[in-house]
Swiss-Prot record:
Subcellular location: Cytoplasm
InterPro entries in the cross-refs: Adenyl_kin_sub (IPR006259), Adenylat/UMP-CMP_kin (IPR000850), Adenylat_kinase_CS (IPR033690), Adenylate_kinase_lid-dom (IPR007862), P-loop_NTPase (IPR027417)
Organism: Anaeromyxobacter sp. (strain Fw109-5)
Recorded metabolic or biological pathway in which this protein acts: Purine metabolism; AMP biosynthesis via salvage pathway; AMP from ADP: step 1/1
Name of the protein in its database record: Adenylate kinase
Any one biological process term the GO annotation gives: AMP salvage
GO CC list: cytoplasm
Enzyme Commission code(s) on record: 2.7.4.3
Described function: Catalyzes the reversible transfer of the terminal phosphate group between ATP and AMP. Plays an important role in cellular energy homeostasis and in adenine nucleotide metabolism.
NCBIfam families: adk (TIGR01351), PRK00279.1-2 (NF001380), PRK00279.1-3 (NF001381), PRK14527.1 (NF011100)
Binding site for ATP: G10, A11, G12, K13, G14, T15, R127, V136, Y137, G199
Length: 214
């Protein structure tokens, strides 16, 4: 089974990727994990990515594709894998198609987790984090015992700039602009399936499994 997961920030895509990986016994592969792995191993790709990020630049398709190629050459992907955060563009999607075809493999399904903008804004803008220990809370879903203060060390909680409503909306708009061509790409190939991303992680997993079985 080879799955690709799409979804805006706050849609719970990463959580579903982990649950699906455990359910089907295949690795969950995210671009963030790949970057961190190469950085930790001190590879040439890792050094290149770090230099680009330190300079405030964007990692090119070629570099990302090379990391994916390296990751998919490992034996743990023999039964399949779940990709989270890649591909992000139609060019990357075409590269992945060619890479898989050269190994006699193909994508099983592309799952797009859809969540209304208001729900995403509420979900993300409610996050509060502790600047001291890094603990993360949510004002309604997972509040601290004393509102505004960390349970562990009583430090004042803060809202990250990325989590402010106006910035969440901006990220949503950027995601939509980048992802619509990708969704059209996979829809034209009959691979795209939409999953409602509202509910408990377990409930969404159950819906996802029904979609995969259909």
């Amino acid at each position: 089974m080879i799955l690709i997961l799409l979804g805006p920030p706050g849609a719970g895509k990463g959580t579903q990727a982990k649950l699906l990986a455990a359910e089907y016994g295949v690795p969950h592969i995210s671009t963030g994990d790949m970057f961190r792995d190469h950085k930790a191993r001190g590879t040439e790709l890792g050094k290149t990515v770090q230099a680009i990020m330190d300079a405030g630049g964007l990692v090119t398709d070629d570099i990302t594709n090379e990391m994916v190629k390296d990751r998919l050459s490992r034996p743990d992907v023999a039964k399949g894998f779940i990709l989270d955060g890649y591909p992000r563009t139609s060019a990357q999607a075409e590269y992945l198609d060619g890479l898989l075809a050269s190994a006699g493999r193909a994508i099983s399904r592309v799952l797009s987790y859809e969540v209304a903008e208001e729900a995403v804004v509420e979900r993300i803008s409610g996050r509060r984090s502790c600047p001291k220990c890094g603990a993360v809370y949510h004002v309604s879903a997972n509040p601290p015992r004393r509102m505004g203060y960390c349970d562990r060390d009583d430090a004042g909680l803060v809202q990250r700039d990325d989590d402010k409503p106006e910035n969440v909306k901006k990220r949503m708009a950027e995601y939509a602009a980048k992802t619509e061509p990708l969704k059209r790409f996979y829809s034209a190939r009959g691979l795209l399936a939409t999953v409602e991303g509202i509910g408990t992680p377990e409930g969404i997993l159950a819906v996802t499994k029904r979609v995969l079985a259909s």
